[in-house]
Amino acid sequence: MGTLREVLPKRLKGIPSQDKPIWLHQAEALPHRNFITSSEKELVDLVRTYGEFTKADFVTYTDYSRTKITSCIDSLLNKKIIIANKATEYSGGRRSKTFGLNGNLGYLAGVDIGATSIDLEIADFSGRLLVRYAEPASVKDGPIKVLGRVCSLLEKMLSENNLSSEKLTGIGIGVPGPVDFSVGTVVSPPIMPGWDRYPVIQTVQQWFPSANVVVDNDVNVMALGEINQGAGKRIPNLIFVKIGTGIGAGIICEGRIYRGSSGCAGDIGHISVNKPGLLCPCGNQGCLETVAAGPAIADRALKAAQAGRSPILLNLYEKNGTILRAEDVGIAAREGDALAIEVIRESGQFIGDVLASLVNFYNPEMIVIGGAVSNLGNLLLSSIRQAVLHRSLPLATRDLKIVFSEIGPDAGVIGAVNLAMDYIFSMSIGSTS
């Protein structure tokens, strides 16, 4: 992995007009316009999900004949989308080739724009990590500054690792706000001033004209990361819950993101749980985020500590320079502080009550808890589990697993890379045969 030096701001080549409709840019489908059939894509999806496959594996996992499988494999080999790898020994002495994605097909970039940071990753087409970088940043600085920095860093990551920008075929971007996925724009984001309907795709496309650019909500992107490399791998029906500055859910239905009719499915942070409750940045009162997101946890704990209920938290507050964070509440809880334990349990209860409704409605196989606040640990997780089990139907929770993310803060960039790959392959289908 190359080292990244300070990147000088690059002048934008002009801001696209916001008065014109903005559509997902389609630079090119697969490199060299290698369109594939829906049958071929099904084989590609299997390899992406499970790893290398033999012909016999493809026959087992599909309804296709061996003749059709052979035809699809030959076509994918000719298009250089997959490659034949080492032969595997089977009982009886017969050896069979395995097939995997061709990493040399191009590069994919994943960008996770958080409220206070940006994380970037470049991988090859097989999903192999080539370089990763992260740095603090404020999304409140606005799209021109943030996207300029993102693109500058991507250029630097490519050049310092001898990767051609012309081979960058896809860029997936996750942002912490509602996204109209059909056009790739952020819509009325509560914590992203200046981003409303800003042409993110067109701006990034000016820097990387050979790349297909796709934008989605950060929680959807994290859910993609979790089902590709995390706890949810090979789980077709899953809910990923991010608990951080805000709270959101990414819904995976039959292996795909469910976005709803306008792209805002899963925005559970703005479900009312405490009426009349505190005013939320969205304009409503008593939203889940006002009682269970990171800032809300810290604020509730601080007010109680200042009222004399927790000397430990008050000491942490003064030690940090009159700042109390959700992680400080976790530290106090681990030291046995009764107030901190109470605040975490109540927050978990609020979250669990909302998730119980989702479990009854959607019946997922797994709920994965991620985001910075998940670092509060098992006390939070057990409170969420208890509420879900208490308020959900027994049949809906019979096989339900509620677990922490296995890939933690990397879920966003991993998911963004897979978002780019999903988009490229989805626009590369040339026929249904």
Question: Where do the protein language model's features map onto the residues?
Answer:
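Glycine-rich phosphate-binding loop and adjoining helix at the ATP-binding site
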Residues: 132-237, 379-391
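Glycine-rich phosphate-binding loop of actin/hexokinase-like ATP-binding domains
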Residues: 231-292
